[in-house]
């Protein structure tokens, strides 16, 4: 971004990764007269083929899970401990896992629950969950299945994508005032020469990884959160896309950031969706993560916008992005 007075905030010296303690934020769309919760019915264009990577399994690039997250040697060890019949050469990993789940009296669709019921030391189960499973689904979702996602819910999922791919960096989730002075707050602009989020203000596309995903909350850092939106930067393709499940244009601070990237990489294409995806009041966090997942999977941005997966699909994907 140019070093003019209008854009000096993003040219500040890089401070700490997070210059100060940030409010744990949530995101959703509050229903108002101008924000209807229902829209026109549309034909579904999204199927399980468009699901975000492996179901409940750690999204490790290039790894094939065959429907079961845990490795075969762990399943064979547990099978022996349970006294089950030895697995035959033709028995699939999925069949063995189902056999174990049945013996433990646990739904085989709930891979974390099966792991937790296995006769293994607690420390080993914790290590296996961290290596092979998606983050645990919050217990509060049982009674409130469409609860707004918060900062921690999103970070836990997206950091697995960063760990599972050596060509991807996740930034966030960050508040919309990421470029403000470190000592800014309600009613004060701040005078510090350090940026609130140093890794955003100091992002260098020349040295960055090929793909960068960013999730923002439209509230500033001192508020509790309002709505989640996202950016995806594809360095090899020289593109930067903005996604808002409500179909709104990038807010000024995000658009300035995107323009700054074009100064670093002349010819970079900027784009955003004009179509509204979300008609409920709760799935903006899921939409933002799903958008980044699909961009990493190579889905063209225009196709993604035309497909516009519905709220119901996003709600179902909570059992996909999080292990139960």
PLM region descriptions:
Residues 293-324:
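Contiguous terminal or domain-adjacent regions
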Residues 161-164, 261, 291, 308:
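Alpha-helix boundary/capping residues
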Residues 38-229, 235-240:
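Cysteine protease catalytic domains with a Cys-His-Asp triad
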Residues 153-157, 253-257, 312, 316:
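Exposed alpha-helical structural elements
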Residues 157-161, 257-264, 320:
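Residues that form generic nucleotide/phosphate-binding pockets
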């Amino acid at each position: 971004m140019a070093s003019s007075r209008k854009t000096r905030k993003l040219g500040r010296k890089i401070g700490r990764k997070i210059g100060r303690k940030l409010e744990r934020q949530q995101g959703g769309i509050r229903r108002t007269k101008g924000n209807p919760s229902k829209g026109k019915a549309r034909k579904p264009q999204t199927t399980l083929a468009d699901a975000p990577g492996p179901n409940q399994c750690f999204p490790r690039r290039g790894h094939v899970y065959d429907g079961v997250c845990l490795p075969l040697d762990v399943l064979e060890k547990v099978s022996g401990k349970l006294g089950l019949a030895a697995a035959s050469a033709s028995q699939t990993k999925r069949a063995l896992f189902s056999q174990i789940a049945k013996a433990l009296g646990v739904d085989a669709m709930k891979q974390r629950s099966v792991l937790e019921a296995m006769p293994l030391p607690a420390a080993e189960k914790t290590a296996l969950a961290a290596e092979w499973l998606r983050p645990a689904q919050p217990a509060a979702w049982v009674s409130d299945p469409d609860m707004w996602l918060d900062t921690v819910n999103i970070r836990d999922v997206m950091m697995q994508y960063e760990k599972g791919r050596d060509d991807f960096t996740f930034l966030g989730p960050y508040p919309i005032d990421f470029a403000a002075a470190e000592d800014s707050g309600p009613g004060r602009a701040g005078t510090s020469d350090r940026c609130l989020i140093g890794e955003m203000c100091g992002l260098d596309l020349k040295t960055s990884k090929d793909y960068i995903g960013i999730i923002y909350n439209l509230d500033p850092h001192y508020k509790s959160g309002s709505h989640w939106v996202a950016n995806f930067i594809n360095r090899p393709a020289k593109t930067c896309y903005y996604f808002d499940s409500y179909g709104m244009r990038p807010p000024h601070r995000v658009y300035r950031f995107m323009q700054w990237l074009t100064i670093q990489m002349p010819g970079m294409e900027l784009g955003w969706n004009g179509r509204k995806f979300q008609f409920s009041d709760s799935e903006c966090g899921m939409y933002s993560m799903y958008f980044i997942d699909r961009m990493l999977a190579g889905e063209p941005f225009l196709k993604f916008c035309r497909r516009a997966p519905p709220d119901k699909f996003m709600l179902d994907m909570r059992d996909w992005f999080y292990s139960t």
